[in-house]
């Protein structure tokens, strides 16, 4: 393998602004030219009444389950509006979906007691049930507006846990048609476009007419962060060139390299 296996290659990342800096760094280190086309935006808008009830009851929870790094940030941003001391979380244990979520939790000097090896919510629930007896324990699932109820249902019905759910952020489609990034994408195209979620795939489809590379521009192949996003690409009819083995910067870089080999 060349020291710069992505030299002269162009890669587009579609994550929300301010996310995926480590992905970009890993790709640039491999020689790629990287541009960003944020197809989604994150808004932290929890239900204040529900949030107040949850924070009032923090000492009652046995586990807090985070399904994303955005959930961690959204929860603790509001947590510290109420409390000034991290010890106010009490003796709760934490479960995280994936290494990015675990990394976000560590930024608050908290360790994850369980991190799912696979990047899907049901795997997190199954691992938690397999390694810990949570029957009759009180669990708080912190999530976003697009997450399905499968994880809370699994924990409640399969593990007989007492489950509360709070949505602390919303993922919304971002229009990029008139942006400089979109104009550059149309003009130059790319070798690879990386999708990090099914909602990013959906946003791309909705804006496909304004994101079509010009004649003579590079026609990109798609790489998915994981199996769920890969399925969304297939269902959308977008040719899939590769899927990362894990939702990490190194795995994304390797998937891009393999897709272009």
PLM features: what roles do these ranges have?
Residues 1-261:
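Signature of uroporphyrinogen-III synthase
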């Amino acid at each position: 393998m060349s020291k710069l296996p992505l030299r002269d290659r162009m890669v587009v990342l579609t994550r929300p602004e301010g996310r995926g800096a480590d992905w970009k760094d890993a790709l640039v280190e491999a020689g790629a030219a990287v541009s960003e086309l944020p197809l989604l935006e994150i808004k932290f808008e929890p239900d204040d009444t529900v949030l107040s009830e949850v924070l009032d009851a923090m000492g009652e929870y046995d586990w807090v389950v985070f399904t994303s790094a955005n959930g961690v940030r959204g929860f603790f941003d509001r947590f510290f509006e109420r409390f000034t001391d991290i010890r106010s979380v009490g003796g709760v244990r934490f479960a995280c979906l994936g290494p990015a979520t675990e990394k976000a939790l560590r930024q608050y000097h908290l360790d994850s007691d369980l991190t799912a090896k696979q990047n899907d919510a049901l795997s997190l629930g199954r691992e938690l049930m397999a390694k810990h007896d949570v029957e009759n324990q009180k669990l708080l699932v912190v999530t976003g507006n697009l997450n399905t109820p499968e994880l809370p249902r699994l924990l409640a019905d399969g593990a007989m846990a007492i489950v509360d759910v709070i949505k602390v952020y919303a993922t919304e489609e971002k229009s990029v048609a008139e942006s400089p990034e979109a104009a550059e994408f149309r003009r130059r195209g790319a070798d690879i476009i990386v999708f990090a979620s099914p909602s990013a795939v959906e946003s791309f489809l909705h804006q496909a007419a304004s994101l079509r590379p010009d004649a003579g521009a590079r026609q990109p192949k798609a790489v998915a962060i994981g199996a769920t996003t890969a399925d969304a690409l297939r269902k959308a009819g977008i040719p899939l060139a590769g899927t990362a083995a894990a939702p990490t910067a190194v795995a994304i870089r390797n998937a891009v390299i393999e897709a272009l080999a």
